[in-house]
Amino acid sequence: EVEPDNAAEPQSFRPGAVLYLKQKASLDAQTVDISSAAFADESFLNDDGELLYDVRDLSTSYDGKKLLFSMRAPEIENADEEDQPTWNIWEYNIESSTLRRIFDSTLNVRAEDGHDISPSYLPGDRILFTSTRQTRAKAVLLNEGKTGYPALDEERNVHAFNLHIMDGDGQNIQQLTFNQSHDLDPILLNNGKVLFSRWDNAGQTRNNGVNLYEINPDGTGLNYLYGRHSHDSGEDGDQVQFLKPKELENGNIAVSLRTFESATFAAQPLEINLDEFIDADRAIDGSDAIEGQAQVAIIDGVTSSDEQTINGQYGAFVPLYDGSNRYLVSWSLCRVALIDIDAETDGDQQGQPEYCTEEKLASDTY
């Protein structure tokens, strides 16, 4: 049984990922593994000779010549949790085919001092990311003569992720936000603001939901934007979260709408009009919104839950920004398998994947 992915646990490690680069968007284009070179030493292999690491949060530079992503090294067998590798930020230069860990080039910052995820480029060779380093919060504590410990989330389970920026070489790290829960998936908008997903699960604003916020790149101007009273807008009243925002060419925002936990990583691509609405049923001026005005599904016939649909399931997606209104998506074809041992079929076909039909989706034997 697959352990569900939990959006409230961004530090989760799911070994088995590899980052590939295709030379062009065609089925027969050459595919190159650009991440495994980071772990070329045999010491990274497990007892079965497997190289099991994890990759997430891919983004590109403005000129398309560099890639940023987060990567976590293989687990150290028999090591305590505090001695395990953390999520680190890596950069791949497409022109030179070189891979580097951002903090490897610095003298004052250790890569393993915190989990670093969701990196993206800022103008001027700076990098925006979210991290458990909490550099400013630690500095304040030290100035007060206290231990510079990183804050835990309100459940006291894991260290809280907050927004940070740094130079391209990993120097001059600055903490932007101080949420007791997690601040995730920051992006720079065309208006110069930073848009991100905030888990509001502490204090007076607590609603145990992930909502959209904005902030200036210098840490000023924190502002709530959307979602606080819209978490029941999923299929069949599912409690959904607004994750991984992206700016569209028309100025609207696209998000991945999904429940906190998902066994399939499935999400509903959703377009939101932040200029005029603060919730699915509420305009900025306080008037009621007609259904479909504030938020609209980008792809019809898919849900925000793990439930199979005839149109399959969508995971990650990104707009192409070429005027075509197209998206690059990860998509899983709808498939079912027989589950009823009394079904009238060859026993050899029991449990084998089959293409979906409406009849099979409605059947109790699949």
Show which residues each predicted segment covers.
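Short, conserved, GDST-rich strand-edge loop motifs in beta-rich repeat architectures
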Residues: 1-14, 70-87, 129-158, 196-210, ...
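Beta-propeller domains
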Residues: 2-49, 73-97, 151-154
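Beta-rich catalytic cores
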Residues: 15, 54-56, 63, 85, ...
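Multi-bladed beta-propeller domains
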Residues: 26-53, 95-114, 167-181, 219-240, ...
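Residue-level detector of Asp-centered blade-edge/turn motifs that repeat once per structural unit
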Residues: 62-63, 122-124, 189-191, 248-250, ...
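Conserved core beta-strand positions within WD40 beta-propeller blades
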Residues: 66, 126-127, 193-194, 252, ...
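Asp-box/WD-like beta-propeller blade repeats and closely related beta-sheet repeat scaffolds
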Residues: 75, 80-162, 171-184
